[in-house]
Amino acid sequence: MTTPLLQDLQDRGLIAQASDLEEIQTLLSQPQTVYCGFDPTAGSLHIGHLVPLIMLKRFQDAGHQAVALIGGATGMIGDPSFKATERSLNSAEIVSGWVNDLSNQIQQLMNHQLSKPMIMVNNADWMRAINVIDFFRDVGKHFSINTMINRESVKQRLQRPDQGISFTEFSYALLQSYDFAELNRQYGCRLQIGGNDQWGNIVSGIDLTRRQNGEQVFGLTLPLITKSDGTKFGKTEGGAVWLDPSKTSPYAFYQFWLGAEDADVYHFLRYYTFLSCEEIASIEAQDQASQGKPQAQRILAEEMTRFVHGEEGLASAERITQALFSGNVQQLSLGELKQLELDGLPSIESAQQDLVELLIESGLASSKRVAREHISNNAISVNGEKVSADNPSLSFPLFDQYWLLQRGKKHFCLVKRAA
């Protein structure tokens, strides 16, 4: 009989591969320890990390113990799985700083939403204690080079004439496999989850844990989240969408989810939110009957912004959205303009008086030519009024301090006139 958790994950389309689904069903009939690893590649997580993080919460909410592993050791090397080129190696100081940042971020994000804390570990804590000879003897002897080079994630690199793979990256699978064996020893961990690109590493960890510990453990991977057009979900024109509000404001985060396509939004509600599949089906049915006024994008944006940034972050995002999209910008008070800046609307301070230069400085145009094209295409507004190509100039600043620049429907920048 399928456990309610596993049935829910299947209904949501959240299981890509499993080492033994029937055995996992049996395993999850009792409380278990489950882990997922996060390598530090920057000082913040991004939305690509949300599905595995949310997956850990789903397990913990179902009565299991979640473990989030930060790869202080593996992050020094970098996972080569399905990467086209060799990763750049970062210094120990940089990686250590990122480890602290991610650990704090995960704890702040997750623990207040859980009835008991998630366990946080750093694989550098045990990898530092192993010398290289012992590692090769005790771990390396269990790995077949033939098997490793035939894994699809490695084979793609080896088949490229312009790219090989260094021994450093090639050894990554051994380190991740050892993590599984170590967590099994320390915490009795018997299930690892990860992205589908981690399948080869997870299988290696299952095998090593069996050989070293005599324990049967299991793995489960999550699907690669793609949009209906086949492209990878999670980035914008400006790059990654970060969970750190200083890198991606709650407003920009909210707008990202609000922009989900109709063909994608119901899948995303299943992947990312804790709304039941029945509730999501009801939302979809209501949207189909609403004649072009769907509510799904707003619900998705609200749920995700609340999850990552809390009620306060959601309120600020909705406040900006209401101000920018529902009325005349010139009706905003000075206090409301200042609040937009505090709430995270893209903002700059400038003494520049030329509109074309300001469009470049604000990031709304990449060059003078592009700025002029936007103006010619009637895509630029200043303080809520379209700019004429015949007279591309700045209007008087609101309250003698602010210009609100807009490109198209969704791109804004608040410019404060420098004193």
UniProtKB/Swiss-Prot annotation:
Family stated for the protein in its record: Belongs to the class-I aminoacyl-tRNA synthetase family. TyrS type 1 subfamily.
GO terms (BP aspect): tyrosyl-tRNA aminoacylation
Coiled-coil spans in chain: none
Gene label: tyrS1
Motif placement: 'HIGH' region: 40-49
Superkingdom of the organism of origin: Bacteria
Subunit structure: Homodimer.
Record keywords: Aminoacyl-tRNA synthetase, ATP-binding, Cytoplasm, Ligase, Nucleotide-binding, Protein biosynthesis, RNA-binding
Listed GO MF terms: ATP binding; RNA binding; tyrosine-tRNA ligase activity
Main location, first listed in the record: cytoplasm
GO CC annotation: cytosol
Positions that bind ATP: K235
UniProt-annotated binding residues for L-tyrosine: Y35, Y172, Q176
Motif ('KMSKS' region): 232-236
First-tier enzyme category under EC: ligase
Matches recorded under InterPro entries: aa-tRNA-synth_I_CS, aa-tRNA-synth_Ic, Rossmann-like_a/b/a_fold, S4_RNA-bd_sf, SYY-like_C, Tyr-tRNA-ligase, Tyr-tRNA-ligase_bac-type, Tyr-tRNA-ligase_bac_1
Catalytic activity: tRNA(Tyr) + L-tyrosine + ATP = L-tyrosyl-tRNA(Tyr) + AMP + diphosphate + H(+)
PANTHER family xref list: TYROSINE--TRNA LIGASE, MITOCHONDRIAL, TYROSYL-TRNA SYNTHETASE
S4 RNA-binding domain ranges (all copies): 353-418
Function: Catalyzes the attachment of tyrosine to tRNA(Tyr) in a two-step reaction: tyrosine is first activated by ATP to form Tyr-AMP and then transferred to the acceptor end of tRNA(Tyr).
EC number assigned by the record: 6.1.1.1
Name of the featured protein: Tyrosine--tRNA ligase 1
Subcellular location(s) per record: Cytoplasm
